[in-house]
Design a protein with these regions (language model features):
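Sequence/structural signature of beta-propeller domains
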Residues: 1-130
Length: 130
């Protein structure tokens, strides 16, 4: 589903098995970072779009699931960053940072109405950075 590059690593998701992978381009090794079936904290389902923070944490948007963007670290820690409530018929799409990494943007594809005309885009920023 989603793919993002960061410092010689390609991160991508596979929805059919709810996994997040990383391909290390320098060693040509493929590694599973997250698997819903084996995770100690299986909160991430419907893995979809991916974006990387400046520190290398992986943000994964859910297609369905709990309508969350979840943070996954290289150490395997997984935690919800945010959740959109009341949009059960939608999915989170297109997470992206502004060039300064001060703001995160994402959309609810069908919004609270569950219709293609109901989509909405959000901007998230930290109050101490604005």
């Amino acid at each position: 589903e989603g793919i993002a590059l960061y410092e010689g690593r390609a991160y991508f998701t596979t929805k059919h098995d709810n996994r997040v992978w990383v391909y290390h381009t320098n060693t040509q090794e493929l590694e599973v970072l997250y698997d819903v079936k084996t995770s100690d904290n299986p909160i991430l389902t419907g893995v979809d779009n991916v974006v990387i923070t400046p520190t290398g944490d992986v943000l994964i948007a859910e297609d369905g699931g709990d309508m969350q963007i979840v943070v996954l670290t290289d150490e395997g820690s997984v935690a919800p960053l945010l959740q959109v409530v009341g949009h059960e018929q939608s999915e989170i799409t297109g997470p992206a940072f502004d060039p300064s990494y001060q703001r995160l943007y994402f959309s609810s594809q069908r919004g609270s109405l569950g219709k293609s005309s109901g989509g909405i885009t959000y901007e998230v920023s930290r109050s101490d950075l604005v």
